[in-house]
């Protein structure tokens, strides 16, 4: 993929308490954890088009920290298709990322290296989104990444 992160000026943000998605489904008193994420001007000014919700959102949806699954703070949670655009990067470099929710916390750190990132979650994507592939305007020489947790 041949890129380097040139901006090391991140602000660390923390949220407590963090329990995770399964907390409400187990009959146990689990000690709270803390969720941490990095941000900067590039991340704060990136636009995220959510195809499922048909709207532009922010990379970090901080209001979602109060949801049952506060991990949804990253790119508004599980969704089939997102297009992230970085107005500060005029390289034209693009990334297509096939992913699960694990990648939602990684993708923000890749934004500064790309003009556009297309994120496809194969668990949720339907043919109605894939039929619109030409609308994504993905370049033929775009980088492609597959990232899944185990």
What are these regions (language model features)?
Residues 1-150:
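Extracellular glycan-modifying ectodomains
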